[in-house]
Regions:
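N-terminal Lys/Arg-rich, disordered targeting/topogenic segments
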Residues: 1-9
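N-terminal pre-catalytic segment of deacetylase/amide-hydrolase enzymes
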Residues: 11-100, 259, 263-267, 281
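Metal-dependent polysaccharide deacetylase catalytic core of the NodB/CE4 family, i.e.
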Residues: 43, 47-50, 55, 98-100, ...
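Aromatic- and glycine-enriched glycan-recognition loops and surfaces
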Residues: 59-73, 107-109, 144-152
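Aromatic/hydrophobic pocket-lining residues that form the small-molecule binding cavity
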Residues: 65, 112, 196, 200
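Alpha-helical scaffolding within the catalytic cores
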Residues: 85-87, 111-115, 141-158, 246-251
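Substrate-binding cleft of extracellular glycoside hydrolase catalytic domains
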Residues: 103-108, 114, 121-124
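His/Asp/Glu-enriched short active-site or ligand-binding loop at hydrolase and phosphoryl-transfer sites
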Residues: 131, 197, 209-217, 224-270
Length: 281
């Protein structure tokens, strides 16, 4: 009887240990998956103007931006650098539990006058998508609008340590027969590849001459994606691309996840509360 009781006890202990093993394995798998992936919303801004000026789909006020930054911090979101996201994917680096990426398209001069002071106030980071022709036109004296940053201003923003730069194309931020990077109907793949490579090389030459370091990332002008451009950019060493498709991104230890990243356009016609609702799928 004692042996039967002992056998029963041993059997019971074995069953419990097996169940605990399964539970522990499941917990470890979940923990590992959580460590190896993040949900990353990207908020896309354009121009930021002083309070009282006209707002539209691509223009927000300084107060709206400050309300966004305050709300993000209050809700536990942490702004991250694009280089940190790439490092997480490629090299196993860490990211906060609730990362968010802020991107300012086109390189408006408001990045220096309106955005940077608020980034410093809220200890935030951002990425600027640079249109090479705008910066170069100002540097050459061909553009006197002063609406955008020239290369010296971009260098100043970069020196803050809070801002990184990515390409928004050299001369393809256009909306004519060719819309952004779209291939023309009668354009051969060879001709398209030659055109795009020339634009990428021009952007590299301008930024290198100006001493402005660019992350190897590309924001599609107007959000127009092009399958042929995807493969060409990868061959040229681009590590990430961004669209204007409004969705949250899942970032994993797989470089493929960095291409065609979705972004939410922050309109000046919406409230911060509506913005926060976008951030979780």
């Amino acid at each position: 009887m004692k042996r039967k009781g002992m056998r029963g006890m041993i059997f019971y202990v074995v069953v419990v240990l097996v169940l605990l093993g399964f539970l522990l394995a499941g917990w470890l798998a979940t923990a590992t998956a959580t460590q190896d992936s993040r949900l990353l919303p990207i908020i896309m801004y354009h121009d930021v103007v002083p309070d009282g000026e006209q707002l539209d789909e691509y223009t927000v006020s300084a107060t709206q931006l400050e309300e966004d930054l305050a709300a993000l911090a209050r809700e536990g979101w942490q702004t991250v650098r694009l280089s940190e996201v790439i490092d997480f994917v490629q090299n196993g680096a860490t990211l906060p539990e609730k990362p968010v990426l802020l991107v300012f398209d086109d390189g408006y001069d408001s990045v220096l006058t309106q955005v940077l002071p608020l980034l410093e106030k809220y200890d935030a980071r951002a990425v600027v998508s640079v249109i090479g022709a705008r910066a170069q036109g100002l540097a050459d004296g061909c553009d006197t609008s002063r609406q955008y940053m020239d290369w010296d201003a971009l260098s100043q923003a970069l020196a803050s340590g809070r801002i990184e730069m990515q390409s928004h194309s050299a001369q393809l931020h256009v909306f004519r027969a060719r819309k952004g990077l779209q291939q023309l109907p009668d354009e051969t793949e060879e001709a398209y590849a030659k055109m795009l490579l020339a634009d990428m090389n021009q952007m590299d030459a301008w930024s290198e001459d100006a001493g402005v370091t660019m992350i190897k990332s590309f924001a599609y002008p107007y959000g127009f994606v092009e399958p042929l451009a995807d493969s060409l950019m990868r061959k040229q060493g681009y590590e990430a691309t961004m669209t204007s498709e409004p969705h949250v991104n899942r970032i994993e230890r797989n470089p493929d996840c960095l291409y065609r990243l979705g972004r939410f356009n922050r309109s000046g016609c919406m409230q911060t509360d509506a913005l926060l609702k976008w951030l979780t799928p």
